[in-house]
């Protein structure tokens, strides 16, 4: 308390109004002192485990399994606790039981001859494991993680040692009673879920929940139930967020990508988006067009010829609409400097050519039934009606709106957390490696200020419903974040969607990356970024997604001498033949950083029936001799501030500046 002697009393007086409010929560010296003791104790607990996952791309089965096994953390805990006392097959079965308790129990009940014996052994093992994973938390925090049905019993078992002679009968009788009253299955499910929850204290999703995979809505539903999560938006997330906000160009892009990969389940089944008007429109305008270049790219999907024909026509129809809608934004926003993407007016329908950068290219598809030569970016009456119907469908999808609000409330363009800087794409740079200046809303911005501004504009796109002008600019910016040349999410000079559909020349398909990617292995670049974001240069890391790591070509996810880590999760099956693996995830626990590479996941069914887990290899990036504690984290800094405030409150009580509440009043 020496800080608050007579010489520093003015500090307390200056904060008296706040301290009086704080006294409502801690109305006595006793209550304030108790809280200081509690908080000081928390500071000395081990740091909680953080789990970093990126680029999920809608692949819900792989992601669900990764979430359940915490990138191998649960298996490592089983190894730590049971070592050589359990066979490998028993460890594997125990892990699978924790991941999928309901499904695994159904199988065990059918095959196990002595179920009561199995229950007893398994309960002891699960309780022992739960004791270990809960040991780094306060009892209060563990209590909040417990299911109400079994909260008291689990807490008793966690805080008792079964090998203590004086409590052994008590401990054993609880377990035997659980089995006797036929509640063992429910208890196993409950404690397995508690273990899953406690092994990871914080989950970071570094972008691209959405894309071509079939279950983005399933993933977000699961994430919305997670106890502690943050999200750094990816380019595929932002285009869906823009679509939900009502940005027509984003809506067209979302539908086009879904049709390109024959993934309509998220749109139709997940969010109830009605695509029948698009199908009708496509059949009317492209009836005689085989739309060869718009055939869906399918992996593990059996589509009949009729389905492929319809999807191809819908795909082409929405693509042309997309180019028109994008043209309107480009013309409306000259500050975007995207005039070179205005290509519809460069088409010579009669000659079947495109004038691209003063060079004439032959078009491989020359059927443009909805294109007006005089006004190529104008929607015809049928197109305008279709776009309005699709927009209404997106805006009025209750589930989509709920999921996008979740992304807004738990997400941002970047995050500083425990000396790590998390973002999906890049920080735009110049060719010389300096931070690139970008002019938006008559402001010239770069680095952190640029991302902060873009983050605010993205929120205005969704929430500024009573300010149409700001909302429209925000929606246009959402589209820019998807494909603009200085977008930190896109990270490329241009998106050559039109060229890939209509030109054979592969050179026109190239998408030049921002210089950021050239400098990713340069520690100087990391230093520039750390200083820009006010992070400790010596002890910070950039954790990045977006670009798959081509492991089979020898690429290393560890860049700039460990300052930058690329953890594209590799969930997207289309990239796996190129990368050679199924991507990387990161674990940051009290002992250091662990980078885990993963082999492709077979299926949840095989995981349950055969005990197949994702095969993973772990690299220890950093290992500390002394475990990191809560006091070394951002949460620790907040707790220190709380302690500081409570110490001021104690002095205020003791100096008579604030009166303690009568103990009787406090109690009654």
Swiss-Prot record:
Catalytic activity: beta-D-fructose 1,6-bisphosphate + H2O = beta-D-fructose 6-phosphate + phosphate
Keywords from the UniProt entry: Carbohydrate metabolism, Hydrolase, Manganese
Any one GO molecular-function label of the UniProt entry: fructose 1,6-bisphosphate 1-phosphatase activity
Protein origin, superkingdom: Bacteria
InterPro entries in alphabetical order: FBPtase_class3, Metallo-depent_PP-like
Catalytic class of the enzyme: hydrolase
Single GO BP term: gluconeogenesis
Pathway: Carbohydrate biosynthesis; gluconeogenesis
Coiled-coil regions listed in the entry: none
EC number(s) on file: 3.1.3.11
Name of a matching Pfam family: FBPase_2
Cofactor: Mn(2+)
Family, per entry: Belongs to the FBPase class 3 family.
Name under which the protein is recorded: Fructose-1,6-bisphosphatase class 3
Source species of the chain: Clostridium botulinum (strain Loch Maree / Type A3)
